[in-house]
Amino acid sequence: MATSTTTLNKDFEWVVTKFETMIKRETEISVAIPTIGILTEVIRNSHATTIMGLQKDLEDAAKQLKTCPFNQSISLSSVCDLFIRFVTRTSLDFPNFDHVNRIKISQLADKFIRDGVTILVHGFSRVVLALLLNAAFQGKRFSVIVTESRPDSSGYKTAARLQAANIPVKLIMDGGVSRIIDKVDYVLCGAEAIVENGGIVNKIGTYQISIVAKAFKKPFYVAAESFKFTRSYPLNQSDIESLKNEHISEPFKVCNSCSNCENPEQLTIDSPTLDYTPPSYITLLFTELGVLTPSAVSDELIKLYY
């Protein structure tokens, strides 16, 4: 049921249009950059004469931003909340925010990439990619196995980037993880959100990979920026529905040819984009705040929000 707290201020409808334009124009930036840029512009244009008035403007703009049908809406929500939390004590200049965070994470995780290791990667993560490229730049020799990552097949993008950097890479089907898991040293993935209990919300398929990794006693590492920390506590997969505005341009194809099945148009297709991985399946999280155990996430959230 709608309440007054969900009423949108039409004066800030422009933030959604601007956000979507920035995302389409700069596909390689994380959600943090346009979000911070837009909220900074809200501050510059605000006619508020008090901190409370400014906070109200920012909250109204943030409510509009959170309506964007964008598949990283959990991260977007976290960025908005953290920005408003620190707006009175943070500079409005964020020129290299994204780049600096990735460099720091790469440095902290560097010792985990040793010569000769084989790493399993799922989906496309800018932080994971930066971490791997940094290790290759240092002359480390390692190989990567990348899942196809349906339904958007983002694994192809990851594989292409790694191949362009002369990093040995192999692309596999999502269903082939259990077949190759004994050949990898550990799993490395990104996150759309890191929740209060140290679990993560990420690309669909992450949870089942973590289950396979644990069964074979393979470490499961997560690399993500701290702006993805969110005050949410999902207990199961269905709880994710309340955390996001899940959006995908089109559902996956059931088969290559209609002759392969009868009446394909009558099939009910479910193509979720995200799933929840509990903290018990995660070994460590690499963030710019440090290398954390899942149990340490709640402490960091307290520092960020309180």
Put a short name on every predicted segment.
Residues 101-114:
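A short, well-structured juxtamembrane/interface segment
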Residues 2, 14, 129-130, 135-141, ...:
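Conserved phosphate- and dinucleotide-binding cores of soluble alpha/beta proteins
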Residues 1-100:
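Long amphipathic alpha-helical segments
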